[in-house]
Amino acid sequence: MEAHDAHVNSEESENPGAAPYGNFINYYTFNPPENRLSLIPEALLQNIGFTSGDGERVLMLDVGCNSGDLSVALYKHLLNKEACTSDSPRQELYMLGFDLDQDLILRAQTSNPFPQNIQFIPLDITDDTESRAVLQAFLGKFGCSRFHLSTCFAVTMWVHLNHGDAAFLSLLSRLASHSEYLLLEAQPWKCYRSAARRLRKLGRSDFDHFKALKIRGDMAAHAREHLEKQCSMELVQCFGNTSWDRSLLLFRRQ
């Protein structure tokens, strides 16, 4: 979900645990969108002061969107359109989803039921120069300086494991700089150990930074501390924990 041109290969097709960047090819079969949507209010946009039916354009960003299943489901969820189809009236809600894996993005683009409102692109969030340029270009089309709501589900660990402590904090800072509100799901530390164990079982070398990481323990608390102390954001609500025991935290720019 955040590095390299990580195309899906035959080994990853046979063993999804071999996706060291989180780019699982069958992710939503074992963690379906409902696991998160059941915790997120349908009226979230209205609750935070944004609407999509009165001419106001609302911009959303989904970081590490994989094959787009959750992105599309969340789009429909927030518009209260369970039976939403491509023929439904266009709403003023626009979403940009990206992932590092071009094969997953191609699947997202091919299956996208709302191409006029949802755009999927390949992008590496750890490439600061490129990601900043691409996101600012998208925002510029709408005359906005930030996304009204950004979502980052289960991405932080992969950036952290593959790029280290500094990249973990930089990711949070970058998301904060582009967002009015940020909905964050940070993987807990036990997931780090599980990811490393999967690689070892496959006979692969360990994550480059795993043993050297100094930021450990309560990862949601570490993320919150950085966002509040370094990024001028504040925690406004916790929507509870998913079935995988991961908290969904909503932050607001102060």
Swiss-Prot record:
GO biological process per UniProt: methylation; negative regulation of pre-miRNA processing
Residue numbers binding S-adenosyl-L-methionine: R36, N66, D99, D124, I125
Subcellular location: Cytoplasm
UniProt cross-references to Pfam families, sorted A to Z: Bin3 (PF06859)
Record domain Bin3-type SAM: where: 34-254
Name of the gene this protein is made from: bcdin3d
Annotated PANTHER family: BICOID-INTERACTING PROTEIN RELATED, RNA 5'-MONOPHOSPHATE METHYLTRANSFERASE
Enzyme Commission number, as recorded: 2.1.1.-
Gene3D superfamilies from the UniProt entry: Vaccinia Virus protein VP39
Top-level taxonomic group: Eukaryota
This protein's name: Pre-miRNA 5'-monophosphate methyltransferase
Organism: Danio rerio (Zebrafish)
UniProt xrefs under InterPro entries: Bin3-like, Bin3_C, BIN3_SAM-bd_dom, SAM-dependent_MTases_sf
One Gene Ontology molecular-function label: small RNA 2'-O-methyltransferase activity
Catalytic activity, reaction form: a 5'-end 5'-phospho-ribonucleoside-RNA + S-adenosyl-L-methionine = a 5'-end (5'-methylphospho)-ribonucleoside-RNA + S-adenosyl-L-homocysteine; a 5'-end 5'-phospho-ribonucleoside-RNA + 2 S-adenosyl-L-methionine = a 5'-end (5'-bismethylphospho)-ribonucleoside-RNA + 2 S-adenosyl-L-homocysteine
Family named by the database record: Belongs to the methyltransferase superfamily.
UniProt keyword list: Cytoplasm, Methyltransferase, S-adenosyl-L-methionine, Transferase
Function: O-methyltransferase that specifically monomethylates 5'-monophosphate of cytoplasmic histidyl tRNA (tRNA(His)), acting as a capping enzyme by protecting tRNA(His) from cleavage by DICER1. Also able, with less efficiently, to methylate the 5' monophosphate of a subset of pre-miRNAs, acting as a negative regulator of miRNA processing. The 5' monophosphate of pre-miRNAs is recognized by DICER1 and is required for pre-miRNAs processing: methylation at this position reduces the processing of pre-miRNAs by DICER1.
Cellular component GO terms, alphabetical: cytoplasm
